[in-house]
Amino acid sequence: MTIAFQLAVFALIATSSILLISVPVVFASPDGWSSNKNIVFSGTSLWIGLVFLVGILNSLIS
């Protein structure tokens, strides 16, 4: 169970880092938002899911 928690935290940190870089690039590029809207929403949905997963796994470990 601990390894699953550690992998979930690593995935959350990696997703946060990717979104931290990619979202401003999408907004700064001309025509970036309209063509990359689905990718940004998918990344955000993944991030929200990982936040809940880390919270659930944390409650099981503690």
UniProtKB/Swiss-Prot annotation:
The chain crosses the membrane at residues 8-28, 41-61. It is a multi-pass membrane protein. One of its GO terms (cellular component) is chloroplast thylakoid membrane. The keyword Transmembrane applies. Keywords: Chloroplast, Membrane, Photosynthesis, Photosystem II, Plastid, Reaction center, Thylakoid, Transmembrane, Transmembrane helix. It is found in: Plastid, Chloroplast thylakoid membrane. Gene3D superfamilies: Photosystem II PsbZ, reaction centre (1.10.287.740). It comes from the Eukaryota. The keyword Isomerase does not apply. Its main location: plastid. May control the interaction of photosystem II (PSII) cores with the light-harvesting antenna, regulates electron flow through the 2 photosystem reaction centers. PSII is a light-driven water plastoquinone oxidoreductase, using light energy to abstract electrons from H(2)O, generating a proton gradient subsequently used for ATP formation. Belongs to the PsbZ family. PSII is composed of 1 copy each of membrane proteins PsbA, PsbB, PsbC, PsbD, PsbE, PsbF, PsbH, PsbI, PsbJ, PsbK, PsbL, PsbM, PsbT, PsbY, PsbZ, Psb30/Ycf12, at least 3 peripheral proteins of the oxygen-evolving complex and a large number of cofactors. It forms dimeric complexes. This is Photosystem II reaction center protein Z. The gene is psbZ.
